[in-house]
């Protein structure tokens, strides 16, 4: 399923993004947050059925990725805000790619911020996966691959 959501336009019905109910719940939360903050939200999901991966792991990894991305995109200039989620099951693995706009200046660290990537690395490692982090000039991309068996 592919979709692009700009502003408050919706092109899906009943918040069914893919075949996995946990993924659907997190994507619905992400879509609502993007609409609320006027972030251009796009996704491309190839998940035809319920994942074999532990639902708590799916929830933890995907919600960490998307919440961090929404928070970073919010700090971008209004005309440039975007968030893209791509995910697919290929063989015995789940691949997730989240890319978001980001400000060119690093935000000031606050007391409780800055642990998102550490938490994500731990979650991915515990699920026998790999993570690739690619900070770009005006964007930030995280690719995660975890076992789905």
Predicted regions located by residue number:
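Short beta-to-alpha transition helix within the HATPase_c
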Residues: 19-37
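Short beta-strand/loop element within the Bergerat-fold HATPase_c
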Residues: 80-92
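Single conserved hydrophobic/aromatic residue that forms the stacking wall/gate
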Residues: 1-7, 11-12
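Glycine-rich ATP-binding loops of the HATPase_c
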Residues: 128-141
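Conserved short strand/loop->alpha-helix "switch" segment adjacent to the catalytic nucleotide/phosphoryl-transfer site
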Residues: 15, 19, 42-61, 111
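A short, flexible helix-to-loop-to-beta junction within the catalytic ATP-binding CA
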Residues: 70-78
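Glycine-rich/acidic phosphate-handling loop/turn and adjacent ATP-lid/helix
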Residues: 92-121
């Amino acid at each position: 399923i592919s979709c692009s959501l700009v502003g408050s336009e919706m092109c899906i019905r009943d918040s069914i993004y893919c075949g996995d109910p946990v993924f659907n719940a997190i994507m619905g939360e992400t879509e609502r947050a993007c609409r609320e903050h006027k972030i251009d939200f796009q996704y491309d999901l190839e998940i035809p059925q319920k994942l074999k991966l532990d639902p708590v792991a799916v929830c933890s990894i995907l919600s960490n990725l998307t919440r961090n991305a929404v928070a970073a995109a919010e700090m971008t200039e209004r005309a440039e805000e975007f968030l893209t989620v791509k995910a697919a099951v290929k063989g015995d693995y789940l691949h997730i790619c989240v890319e978001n706009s980001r400000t060119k200046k690093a935000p000031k660290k606050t007391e409780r911020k800055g642990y998102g990537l550490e938490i994500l690395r731990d979650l991915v490692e515990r699920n026998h996966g790999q993570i690739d982090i690619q900070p770009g000039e005006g964007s930030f991309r995280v690719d995660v691959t975890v076992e789905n068996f």
